[in-house]
From Swiss-Prot:
GO terms for biological process: glycine biosynthetic process from serine; tetrahydrofolate interconversion. This is Serine hydroxymethyltransferase. The gene is glyA. PROSITE patterns: SHMT. Catalyzes the reversible interconversion of serine and glycine with tetrahydrofolate (THF) serving as the one-carbon carrier. This reaction serves as the major source of one-carbon groups required for the biosynthesis of purines, thymidylate, methionine, and other important biomolecules. Also exhibits THF-independent aldolase activity toward beta-hydroxyamino acids, producing glycine and aldehydes, via a retro-aldol mechanism. The record marks 226 as: Plays an important role in substrate specificity. (6S)-5,6,7,8-tetrahydrofolate binds at residues 118, 122-124. Pathway: One-carbon metabolism; tetrahydrofolate interconversion; Amino-acid biosynthesis; glycine biosynthesis; glycine from L-serine: step 1/1. It comes from Mycobacterium leprae (strain TN). The lineage of its organism: Bacteria, Bacillati, Actinomycetota, Actinomycetes, Mycobacteriales. Coiled coil: none annotated.
Length: 426
């Protein structure tokens, strides 16, 4: 019971050490990833992992919950206060679990769901045919304008009037612009639908006022706690009080059994951090970094190489890069950036002719680098490196760029001394 991981399971300890090294010495630019603070790591690696706590605070199906009840109430209160919501459920294990609970609370199987098409930036849980949301419900989709790559609210309204959904979704996985929540609310009211907003990607920006809040407009809002919010991987549901009972029942017993109390403790810590001036500064640098990247990738030398930015820029923490007119496909560009030490993910772009495992685009995000402390100068340097890779292709000096990336990463150390604490048991 007291032996450290390195002694009990050296194979896993070695792999954890290697992953720590990878995170330290590369530049993480996957838009859905971030680095949690050590305080969150400590909470999620705590003795709370031992406790079963089915039910809600004060109404558990297990004894011995007097302390975890307080933990969960703190997390719920912090979530409500941070986002100005009537109620919060902090039990979902993930964003997908949160989304499933929302749909089960608001709809019955066979009813109609309208969301952003996956090929235009939507999420799997917004009605993709192979996902539970596409199997249980009749799904319809709206897309983006073929020229501007923006969501046309007149087109959304027309589709909603035609399709008459029970639930209208506003949210995305790869869309670089702010959504018009008031317009979505108006359309939902016109067709008699409930409005669900999935703010998983931009919740951190909402928390500090850098992005409009969907909470005043939506019936229910779901989010992850990682991504821009910077906590551990998990989900969260907010909304109007009238939906609290249905949401709570859809989470437990509808979707899950016992909540992960160690993860809920980590959520509570992350939600407290989100109220600090340091967190606001981080979100400001996240947004500034994305705009620096978008500006660099719309410069003449980059566009001459056939690279473009979807919608021409960004309002959020990510840039969606279109490579259809360049020598690259998404997989090849991802692989070459990986060689120089920058981690991104290939992503479909609107009207993408390539299959999803290849794609014609990249989704590049700035939250993790902002968390490390990157500012304008560093984001400018990173943007130049990415531009060099995408414009020079096979002739790029990988070794030189890798050295530059390693220097940048080591200028902003990550988790100093963590291997001693996490692997050796100190």
């Amino acid at each position: 019971m007291v032996a450290p991981l390195a002694e009990v399971d050296p194979d896993i300890a070695e792999l954890l050490g290697k992953e720590l090294g990878r995170q330290r010495d590369t530049l993480e630019m996957i838009a859905s990833e971030n680095f949690v603070p050590r305080s969150v790591l400590q909470a999620q690696g705590s003795v709370l992992t031992n406790k079963y706590a089915e039910g809600l605070p004060g109404r558990r199906y297990y004894d011995g919950c007097e302390h975890v009840d307080v933990v969960e109430n703190i997390a719920r209160d912090r979530a409500k206060a941070l986002f100005g919501a009537d109620f919060a459920n902090v039990q979902p294990h993930s964003g997908a679990q949160a989304n499933a609970a929302v749909l089960h609370a608001l709809m019955s199987p066979g009813e109609r769901l309208l969301g952003l098409d996956l090929a235009n930036g939507g999420h799997l849980t917004h009605g993709m045919r192979l996902n539970f949301s596409g199997k249980l419900y009749e799904t319809g989709f709206y897309g983006v304008d073929a020229t501007t790559h923006l969501i046309d609210m007149d087109a959304v309204r027309a589709k909603a009037l035609e399709f008459r959904p029970k639930v209208l979704i506003a949210g995305w996985s790869a869309y670089p612009r702010i959504l018009d929540f008031a317009a979505f609310r108006s359309i939902a009211d016109e067709v008699g639908a409930k409005l669900w907003v999935d703010m998983a990607h931009f919740a951190g920006l909402v928390a500090v006022g850098l992005h409009p809040s969907p909470v005043p407009h939506a019936d229910v809002v779901s989010t992850t706690v990682h991504k821009t919010l910077g906590g551990g991987r998990s989900g969260l549901i907010l909304g109007k009080q009238e939906f609290a009972t249905a949401i709570n029942s859809a989470v437990f017993p509808g979707q899950q059994g016992g909540p992960l109390m160690h993860v809920i403790a980590g959520k509570a810590v992350a939600l407290k951090i989100a109220t600090t001036p340091e967190f606001t500064d981080r979100q400001q640098r996240t947004l500034a970094g994305a705009r620096i990247l978008a500006d660099r990738l719309t410069a003449a030398d980059v566009t001459k190489a056939g690279v473009s930015v979807v919608s021409g820029g960004t309002d959020v923490h990510l840039v969606l890069v279109d490579l259809r007119n360049s020598p690259f496909d998404g997989q090849a560009a991802e692989d070459l950036l990986h060689e120089v030490g920058i981690t991104v993910n290939r992503n479909v772009v609107p009207n993408d002719p390539r299959p999803p495992m290849v794609t014609s685009g990249l989704r590049i995000g700035t939250p993790a680098l902002a968390t490390r402390g990157f500012g304008e100068a560093e984001f400018t340097e990173v943007a130049d490196i990415i531009a060099t890779v995408l414009t020079t292709g096979g002739s790029v000096d990988v070794a030189a760029l890798r050295q530059q990336v390693t220097r940048l990463a080591r200028d902003f150390p990550l988790y100093g001394g963590l291997e001693d604490w996490s692997l050796a048991g100190r």
